[in-house]
């Protein structure tokens, strides 16, 4: 029997009034908004994005593969649980899920905006709304905040504001908004320490690094999907190889929706490259092997990665977390129980507990009765 199941990665569908009602008045005329495109249906228009975001795939959970389309959806026909708290709890019940860690949807694309001041205004508005969304059921809706990282001092202040809103963690953009530096720079160490002191796990979600922009792919467009995971792998290896975890051993990073079955080979490759090539490639001298930092400091989420279910013993089972990704097109909702019975029920009880409940509860300090 499973403990109360916690999805480590679920999403909202930002409602049309979210940004219009909450954004800094300076940006009101340019606030992200829902408009109807005659060919594509309802889409989110955001200043600075060349293409509007179609809402159909944002809320396509439960649709059969042959019905999935980026066109034609109307907001009023989407899963109401994407923005309505009461409806969301019913959606959880339908999938046999007790609680969810909540990420944005439109907010993922906002991470990729070039106008960092506008990005900051959008993220501030989202933080206010997601706190309101989660407030009626804080034990079942685990909200995370956002910040663009325009400066270290501002980001630390944002961390404190996010904590004060009752949110449990922070989703960072794949690239910081500070010019000419990346997260491996030592200037970020005070920010990592602030996250540790505030007990805020930091997440990197796929599609927040601009990895799909300006890229060409061999073969058909289906090949583009694999770059999504590689972008997150690059972030994780950067944290490991640059010594971020060595300098900040209590830092907790979550690699979100990039699957996990690749981890055993990836950590082998980290160690191989470190042993054989670190002098030539100017890698940092680490106190432990790269694999040890990866397996201790990085948490990973996945939905239906069958390899991950079968390779728990080859990873750190205390860092692997299942998710249903509701209401996105990759979601296992409303069939999650069928999936879990097939792949999780055969696992040892301890691994079942860690995968579906314990790891998420420990990471976010959740007090959920078993």
Task: Indicate where each model-derived feature is located.
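Catalytic pocket-lining loop regions of alpha/beta-barrel enzymes
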Residues: 121, 134-142, 147, 152-321, ...
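Short, solvent-exposed turn/loop segments enriched in Gly/Ser/Thr/Pro and often Arg
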Residues: 8, 38-40, 103-107, 145-150, ...
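Active-site metal-binding loops of divalent metal-dependent hydrolases
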Residues: 10-11, 325-326
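Mid-to-C-terminal alpha-helical segments outside catalytic/metal-binding sites
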Residues: 2-4, 15-64, 69-71, 75-79, ...
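Short acidic, glycine/proline-rich loop/turn micro-motifs
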Residues: 111-114, 216-218
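Active-site-proximal gating segment of KS-fold condensing enzymes and close homologs
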Residues: 117-133
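Divalent metal-dependent hydrolysis catalytic cores, especially in the metallo-beta-lactamase
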Residues: 72-80, 90-113, 140-146, 168-172
């Amino acid at each position: 029997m499973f403990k109360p199941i916690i999805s480590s990665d679920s999403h909202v569908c930002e409602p049309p009034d979210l940004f219009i009602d909450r954004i800094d008045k300076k940006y009101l005329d340019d606030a992200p908004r829902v408009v109807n495109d005659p060919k594509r249906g309802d889409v989110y228009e955001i200043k600075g994005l060349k293409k509007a975001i179609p809402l159909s795939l944002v809320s396509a959970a439960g649709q059969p593969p042959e019905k999935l389309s980026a066109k034609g959806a109307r907001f009023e026909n989407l899963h109401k649980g994407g923005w309505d708290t009461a409806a969301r709890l019913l959606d959880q019940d339908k999938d046999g899920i007790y609680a969810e860690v909540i990420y944005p949807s439109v907010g993922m694309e906002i991470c990729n905006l070039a106008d960092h001041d506008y990005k900051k205004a959008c993220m501030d508005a989202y933080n206010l709304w997601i706190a309101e969304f989660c407030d009626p059921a804080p034990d079942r809706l685990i909200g995370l905040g956002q910040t663009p990282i325009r400066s270290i001092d501002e980001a630390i202040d944002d961390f404190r504001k996010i904590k004060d809103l009752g949110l449990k963690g922070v989703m960072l953009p794949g690239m910081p908004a500070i010019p000419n530096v990346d997260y491996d720079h030592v200037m970020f160490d005070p920010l990592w320490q602030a996250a540790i002191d505030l007990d805020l796990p930091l997440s990197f979600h796929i599609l927040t690094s601009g990895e799909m922009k300006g890229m060409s792919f061999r073969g058909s467009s289906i090949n583009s999907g694999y770059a999504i995971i590689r972008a997150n792998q690059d972030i994780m290896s950067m944290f490991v190889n640059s010594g971020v975890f060595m300098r900040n051993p209590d830092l907790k990073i979550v690699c979100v929706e990039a699957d996990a079955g690749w981890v055993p080979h990836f950590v082998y490759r980290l160690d191989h490259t470190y042993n054989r090539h670190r002098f030539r490639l100017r890698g940092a001298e680490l106190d432990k092997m790269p694999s040890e930092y990866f397996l201790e400091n990085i948490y990973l989420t996945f939905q239906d990665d069958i390899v991950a279910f079968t390779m728990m013993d080859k990873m750190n089972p205390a860092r692997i977390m299942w998710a249903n990704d509701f209401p996105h097109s990759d979601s296992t909702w409303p069939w999650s129980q069928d999936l879990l019975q097939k792949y999780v029920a055969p696992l040892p009880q301890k691994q079942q507990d860690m995968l579906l409940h314990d790891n998420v509860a420990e990471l976010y300090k959740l007090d959920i009765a078993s």
